[in-house]
């Protein structure tokens, strides 16, 4: 089940100090939110991108709604550069790609193709976008959305393959060395509970999968931030050159596998769950987004977006700054730390407008 991200539940604002005017901070220690106003850029080339990211001087988008799969735009003005790789099963085609996270400053990026068990690196060569490297995945763990460190180490999530109705499907956080093929280096059990239900009806097989506390990953340098949204925990790892994941710190309440496994996933009202999302990591900061929706009446799925807030922390989870985006409906947000900009768009529409925000920390 895909859960919507509705807002932080925070206590009332607290005044700082007993004397003097002082700016008020909320219960978490954030100063009042700064409202950011957007510039708008029209986009015509791509329809409904499934994935996107910032890679050096480029924004890269992947779409399965067009004949070409990969689109690049030069930042910060979103000047269209090229569309590449036809949708198909040929050696120079892409069936469908999942963009991997990386902070490569040279503009190269990685795409995973689980159907063919491939990881591919793309970048400029001879004046055009080309495939630079292919890594085969000979392991039993398919790669969908992962984080790549220095083009050598990949970290991704993997769920155990099970059949039937299972109350607790294990989720693993795994690291792989990237040679000619992937090789498993390290694997950790995630603080996640997944419930799987399978049944047969009218000669058809059905399955529903619901996850409580699914991890969200962002990498920068040799650090990996892992955000557990339902328990509000941030785990920070150092990833060694050998691919070993070394836990540096856990932020938030006590986290244990017993605590997670005791949760009754089937009883959770997901429509009223308040979960922020980890959207970016930079050298100094972590960015979390909270989207506020109008209450669902059970009949109309087109809830109104009431608020779109970005909270910025340092890597020790100290509050730094809070921003409100004026284009509330632009709920997909990418952070460009090199230029101190955020780019946002409304995923309910075709990719018609990009909203550009400048921010200061």
Q: Model segments located where?
A:
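A short helix->beta-strand "capping" segment at the edge of beta-propeller domains
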Residues: 24-47, 318
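Beta-propeller blade signature
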Residues: 169-181, 302-318, 356-361
